[in-house]
């Protein structure tokens, strides 16, 4: 399936329904809606009987999520946001398929007309529940792994999980042009093109970007972007942007692009 990307900006935080309607001018036909901070591993095949698919994952604390209830035919019969009492342990992960996105667009337009005050949020769930009331068939898609990138802590965890998946699949994670001098690499780790690591112990769960230099460091569970320079750091959790120069000894650090700190 080919992709024809467009970018629309949501200038005000008015909910997930509003975010979708920011792209109203191009909403037509089969459409996937996916939250940008979510990574999954799943079979994304579609049920031909479905008007829409919502991908879900079993969770230990369903009260923190939107959850779905299913019948024996894997059809979604209810959608509840952060239930106070147990409804289901199948959490909505933020990836949806609509066979005809125009239907969702129309019901969200009605939500705006009928019930919203100016500046009030509206959510995709309101549109989905309205579609279910119209008799639209929503099926549940299951995912094998659901990884979040919503904050630095979980992003580092997701990076480590992705590295492990890539290792198990036999993918080459260390670029042949990377230089290792008197250093130890504990897999899984990614080392990008032209990176140079000297007198350091790296891993597990570390990604080092293209052209980055690591000197006299001990790094675990860290994400280092491109063309940065780290010196004398012993750190278990680091998120470092592009073109950063950092010298220090933290247990956790998060620095954006073009930062310098000594």
Predicted regions and their residues:
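Conserved beta-loop-beta/alpha segment of the NTase-like Rossmann-fold superfamily
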Residues: 1-72
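Short beta-strand-to-turn element immediately C-terminal to the catalytic PLP-Schiff-base lysine
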Residues: 68-71, 97-99, 241, 247
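Fold-independent oxyanion-binding glycine-rich loops
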Residues: 10-11, 35-37, 56-59, 72, ...
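Extended, small-residue-rich solenoid/repeat segments and analogous flexible loops
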Residues: 129-205
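Structural signal for interior beta-strand "rungs" in well-ordered beta-sheet cores
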Residues: 172-262
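Catalytic-core segments of class I nucleotidyltransferases/pyrophosphorylases
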Residues: 75-164
């Amino acid at each position: 399936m080919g992709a024809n990307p467009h970018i629309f900006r949501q200038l005000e935080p008015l909910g997930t329904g509003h975010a979708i309607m920011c792209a109203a001018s191009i909403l037509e036909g089969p459409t996937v809606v996916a939250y940008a901070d979510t990574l999954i591993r799943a079979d994304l095949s579609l049920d031909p009987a479905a008007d829409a698919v919502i991908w879900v994952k079993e969770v230990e604390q369903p009260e923190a999520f939107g959850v779905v209830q299913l019948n024996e035919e894997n059809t979604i019969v209810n959608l509840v946001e952060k239930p106070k009492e147990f409804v289901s342990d199948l959490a909505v992960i933020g990836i949806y398929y609509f066979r005809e996105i125009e239907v969702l667009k129309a019901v969200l337009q009605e939500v705006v007309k009928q019930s919203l005050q100016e500046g009030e949020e509206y959510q995709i769930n309101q549109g989905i529940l309205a579609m279910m009331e119209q008799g639209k068939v929503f099926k549940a898609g299951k995912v094998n792994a659901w990884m979040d990138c919503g904050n630095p802590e979980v992003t580092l965890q997701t990076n480590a999980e992705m590295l492990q998946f890539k290792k198990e699949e036999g993918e080459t994670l260390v670029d042949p042009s990377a230089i290792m001098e008197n250093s130890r690499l504990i897999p899984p780790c990614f080392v990008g093109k032209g990176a140079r690591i000297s007198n350091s112990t790296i891993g597990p769960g570390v990604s080092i970007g293209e052209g980055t230099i690591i000197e006299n460091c001990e790094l675990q569970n860290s994400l280092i972007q491109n063309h940065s320079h780290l010196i004398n750091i012993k750190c278990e959790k680091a998120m470092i942007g592009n073109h950063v120069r950092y010298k220090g000894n933290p247990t956790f650090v998060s620095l954006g692009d073009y930062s310098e700190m000594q």
